[in-house]
């Protein structure tokens, strides 16, 4: 029998793993979607990413339905990628989380009392105040409340806890991506129209001075592109009329390049509209050959960049 090397002894392996945890804390960004989990981390000054698909129906409307299975998937993804000592920063899925701009509360006078008073007046969203968690944060010159059911937030906390990982931060994919978008388009002085996929639908967010004022979803199944374009145009025109604000629009399209072409007719050059999309300076590399079947989507990458950049 060939001699057993020290590295193959289970006790030594456990000791080495524990030592790695003590010596190196690894920041890991974890982005959860309805379909998959994406993890990003830094290794030797370079950023990498890897994804794993959830089992069927594991995540439904943003809620983890199979916590133990999902926890094992998270643990396995990091273990197979040799990521030890991870401290997780989690981005919640698009579904199940809501946001609203607080009326009468400006970022210049933002404090907990002002936001609490605004929240106590009730918000037009499908969340029960007694059964939800709400946080209010400055957004440009306004304050935005982001809310989620406590059961959903606790379910995601449980997924991370069962993987024996410390959870350092929880954010939301959409609001984090919007903060990054504001940062990337800071030199644009007009309004911003942001389009991205939401399941089989298309979501439009209209932004003025860094504040999201309209968030509307458009069905896409069975709808001809021309009809969809017309619907979006009507919403934009209604917003501009209501605000008495007819300024050029900068469009940010968070779709794969081939899908962006569908929405290019929305950009009205005669009104000095333009496409704000720009190449991302941060492009993590896939980890290994089995990093995932699909590349990072533009919305996912926008949100991950938002986690890395402190935006004031």
PLM feature spans:
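Hydrophobic/aromatic-enriched cytosolic interaction surfaces used to assemble or bind macromolecules
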Residues: 1-312
């Amino acid at each position: 029998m060939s001699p057993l090397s020290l590295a193959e002894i289970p006790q030594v392996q456990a000791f080495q793993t524990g030592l790695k945890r003590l010596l190196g804390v690894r920041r890991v960004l974890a982005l959860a979607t309805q379909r998959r989990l994406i993890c990003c981390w830094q290794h030797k000054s370079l950023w990498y990413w890897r994804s794993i698909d959830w089992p069927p129906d594991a995540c439904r409307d943003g809620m983890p339905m199979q916590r133990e299975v999902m926890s094992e998937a998270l643990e396995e993804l990091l273990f197979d990628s040799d990521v030890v000592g991870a401290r997780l920063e989690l981005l919640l899925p698009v579904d199940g989380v809501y946001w609203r701009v607080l009326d009468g509360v400006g970022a210049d006078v933002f404090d907990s009392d002002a936001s609490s008073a605004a929240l106590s007046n009730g918000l037009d969203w499908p969340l029960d105040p007694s059964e939800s968690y709400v946080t209010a944060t400055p957004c440009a010159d306004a304050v935005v409340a982001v809310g989620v059911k406590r059961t959903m937030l606790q379910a995601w906390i449980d997924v991370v806890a069962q993987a024996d990982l410390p959870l350092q931060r929880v954010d939301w994919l959409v609001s984090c991506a919007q903060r990054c978008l504001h940062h990337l388009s800071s030199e644009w002085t007009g309004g911003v129209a942001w389009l991205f996929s939401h399941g089989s639908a298309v979501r439009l967010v209209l932004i003025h001075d860094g504040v999201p004022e309209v968030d509307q979803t458009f069905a896409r199944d069975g709808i001809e592109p021309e009809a969809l374009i017309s619907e979006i145009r009507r919403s934009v025109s209604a917003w501009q009329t209501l605000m008495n604000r007819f300024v050029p629009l900068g469009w940010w399209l968070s779709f794969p390049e081939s899908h962006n072409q569908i929405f290019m007719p929305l950009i009205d050059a005669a009104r000095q509209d333009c496409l704000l999309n720009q190449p991302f300076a941060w492009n993590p590399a896939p980890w290994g050959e089995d990093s995932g079947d699909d590349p990072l989507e533009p919305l996912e990458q926008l949100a991950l960049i938002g986690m890395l950049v402190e935006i004031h």
